[in-house]
């Protein structure tokens, strides 16, 4: 039995990671120590589980050993400067918000009003790959910040947010990695827009993810344990002002049980399905 132990000085939690020669439906759920009877009970309520993973996120050092690229170094240096000196300039905020959040000027204006530096750092911390998190994810986070600042009484009753974001660059990396970039470009032409969409859809469904992305998927699955996961689209167009894009792309529910290999396969298939749904007729007609 291999497990992690966490405490916030009020409650004690264990989170099983590996178990040998035994099985139960709740085995990989986080458990809370019940002092009154000396037992550990699995966390099942959404509120309790969200609180637990907020604690894990605060205690876990995510600065793993890795070769940082220029963007990662920029974020790391920016965060260090802010922590030590309290400096977070408008120019730096412009770079981060344009790169990670949105290019919509109205959204960017709201971000400057409601987002704090730590909000940007938390988004970065929860990203798989790089690029933009898309309109739906950005809008959801912004809505929470508006409620937090303008209606703190209501915000106090909201569950902690607990999502990961697949950066827009991963979409293009997936295309290049699976060698159908040329098909992707030809599909964008007037002649190939509808004609090549079914072929491109199949390419999305049959591709594989780069190993670096798969490793980040595994880390995310380790973090969530065997909690159900919903993979949702959040394209650059979705939920922008005047461009709702509602219901055009797929959302996929992952049961997220079984071995790590089974859970990883389920997650990868869900992401493939969402990517492929960009080629459905309804979405194509909406984007014209």
Cite the ranges covered by each PLM segment.
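Nucleotide/phosphate-binding sheet-loop regions of phosphoryl- and nucleotidyl-transfer enzymes
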Residues: 1-288
